[in-house]
Amino acid sequence: EGFKIRQALFWDISPSQDATVALDYRGKQGAGVDLEYRYYLSKNSDGRVWTRYFKDNQLNAKRWDLIFRHRTNFPDDLQGRVDLNYVNQQDTFRALSEDILQRVAVFQESQAFLSKRWDNHVLYGFTRFSQNLTSLSDKTVLQTLPQIGYSLAPAKLWESIPLYGGLDVTFDSFHRQEGLDGSRGDMFPRLWVPIPIDRYLTVTPLVGVRETWYSRSAQSSDAVTREAVYFSTTADTRLIRRFTQEGGGTFTHKIEPAVTYEYLAPSQQADIPFFNDVDRFTRKNLLTYSLTNRLSAMI
């Protein structure tokens, strides 16, 4: 690169806005300029825009990249996020970046996310656009446009009986310019009952059924499905002892041993499209032991 100079000019536009312009001179490699603008609309909304132009003399390339971040927390637990990343040359990070992880990255992603939360469940939607940093002309890169999901956190279903439930539901629409694309719906309901055995041991059996539906839009109009049964049983206990400190205050020591058995039935997957890790899982027949120690203090 030769002799390098970076000179920045900071402009405090207002209490809620600022901007920075920087000259980036790298001797034999070339020169460029980058601009950053930050804004703070309120405690619930802010963002940042950063862009760079660099004339690379060594590789005869005009490089331009862009980063945009925005966050807004709306009333009633509604949240929105935008994370946009773009480069016009696939080797820009290898040529200009000093961040090792950025220099070796294969893909760069942009996302937009919107979620609505309640006490024990959430509804969300997001889109994901990816660039292949080894070949920007790659038309087989998978794009998620969009994903819609719903998640029910562990919740007691009836007051009169100790029956609990959880649910995860997603719908994805996958697109490629070339290659396999389509849609996928995935639903995983679960039910479990904690059963106290004497006063020291609790056994919790859980059963869930996972149903996945596929529509291969470009290759076939026929839908395919996959079903899988999941079962687990956990036996756990909790030992608690409280200690008083000489100077006042107390601390509590908790020991929580547990044993969990999990079984996931095998499923036919030969005819299932592959978009990401959700589409492939292996049979599970697993026994897990755990021992958790917790210390908490009251001063």
Regions found by a protein language model. Name each.
Residues E1-I299:
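Outer-membrane beta-barrel proteins and related beta-barrel translocases across Gram-negative bacteria
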